[in-house]
From Swiss-Prot:
It comes from the Bacteria. This is Protein RecA. ATP binds at G64, P65, E66, S67, S68, G69, K70, T71. InterPro entries: AAA+_ATPase, DNA_recomb/repair_RecA, DNA_recomb/repair_RecA_CS, P-loop_NTPase, RecA-like_C, RecA-like_N, RecA_ATP-bd, RecA_C_sf. Belongs to the RecA family. GO terms for cellular component: cytosol. Keywords: ATP-binding, Cytoplasm, DNA damage, DNA recombination, DNA repair, DNA-binding, Nucleotide-binding, SOS response. Its main location: cytoplasm. Can catalyze the hydrolysis of ATP in the presence of single-stranded DNA, the ATP-dependent uptake of single-stranded DNA by duplex DNA, and the ATP-dependent hybridization of homologous single-stranded DNAs. It interacts with LexA causing its activation and leading to its autocatalytic cleavage.
Amino acid sequence: MSDRQAALDMALKQIEKQFGKGSIMKLGEQAERKVSTVSSGSLALDVALGVGGYPRGRIIEIYGPESSGKTTVSLHAIAEVQRQGGQAAFIDAEHAMDPVYAQKLGVNIDELLLSQPDTGEQGLEIAEALVRSGAVDIIVIDSVAALVPKAEIEGDMGDSHVGLQARLMSQALRKLSGAINKSKTIAIFINQIREKVGVMFGNPETTPGGRALKFYSTVRLEVRRAEQLKQGNDIVGNKTKVKVVKNKVAPPFRVAEVDIMYGEGISREGEILDMASELDIVQKSGAWYSYNEERLGQGRENSKQFLKENTDLREEIAFFIREHHGISEDSGAEDMEDPSLLD
């Protein structure tokens, strides 16, 4: 053994003795090569994310205009984690959580941990304590813009507080990122949109809370309403586009189109029908949709209703879509029950 190798081995032993086993290792020795994920609750979004869902132990930012469906997208992720036996938490800084709507989306509100903090510092400290416990699988912070620093709350209305929120977020993310990775918690930060003043060229839109969240996020999703969905004269929902604007675990810039129905959330039938039609799993002839020469219905809404009533057929079609894109179902379910991840 060369002197260099002996010196390296000695240094590695010293590091492990000082900081614990696993504090340094060769990249190939890592037990987990493949990114462990949890489904987003939307098949179209799972495909757009490229790895079959949200990566565990990472920070996700979901941003977009008001009433575009940001909270709906995050509540579907909570419902999916709970369905797989995981623990979820919701930091409601906006004080606008609707338990009735959450329940309709499949969230078990009896098991969901909810905090409505008074200040930004309090909200982020609660989030840190939950992450460090190692017992929470997903935590949603709604929203970054509502995480108001204590100094701003205690000050007067006209006081200037330049950069306070950005500093708060920067400090919090420095502390949180390592703990999130170790505990395999998915941390979803919901954010709003602001306009930069005096921008002549380029996009004037920006997100509040400084640049730290943009850097620390593994995935950034932009949620925007595309068009209204009508049934007769009634508006029953919105067609929504979710664009993956940043992705460190798969190619970015993919777009998922979903129907967000009022009082129901993301329409599983709608996304399955659209994706199956694109892949020719479901055939579309004129206004008729058919599968294996069996007619599903005339028109998109009738076909969606047919799939809603025939869940076995719907899940069979979903299985073929997942198979085509190489996505396995419940990829993160076994991780939630693996206590070794919490060591």
